[in-house]
Amino acid sequence: KTLEDFDWQFNPSIKRKPLYDLATGRFIREARDVLFLGPPGTGKSHLAQALGHQAIKSGFVVLYRSIFDLVRDFLHDEALAGQDKTLERYLRPDLVIIDDMGMKQLPKRSGEYLFEIIMRRYQVRSTMMTSNRPLEDWGKLIGDVPAATAILDRFLHNAEVLAINGKSYRLRSRSEKENTAADPLACSVEEK
């Protein structure tokens, strides 16, 4: 996905300038973080992937994982006593993108894994996250309020927080299909 592929007209409240500024990669060179906050379906993941894609084109090493993949990686390697290897995988890239933070409550110890990554990357390497949950919910979702507080304290210190609000892109295609099916003229034009 790219910034050029993004439908800017669908949610005009999403400003292009800050996103194209991020696409320069300066935030990565300066070891700053980025957080996309907003309702589901508004394009947060698309924008994060587009910025990751641009970073790769600019020569940066990028790792993209959902929060569920991250937790699964650590739980799997913890069972195999290989946690340091997994941690190194998350510390090495210039940019780590963690998608869907807060989609649902995470398993026990997830806060420890996320804290370790954020703490070790803090002011050294960039991290980008997407979330559809307000920050005050993170303690409950992580299951560890002190860990969530420490994560947010470090992560937000040098982070650019972008509110991505508007209508759901996913529901747009559904409503377009329903409108087309309900409109007999549209159906007759399509049938010709």
Task: For each feature predicted by the language model, list its residue ranges.
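Charged, amphipathic alpha-helical linker segments immediately N-terminal to NTP-binding catalytic cores
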Residues: 1-17
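Short hinge/gating elements
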Residues: 5, 34, 137-139
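Conserved P-loop
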Residues: 14-92, 141, 191
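Conserved active-site beta-strand-loop modules that form the wall/rim of enzyme catalytic pockets
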Residues: 45, 94-96, 126
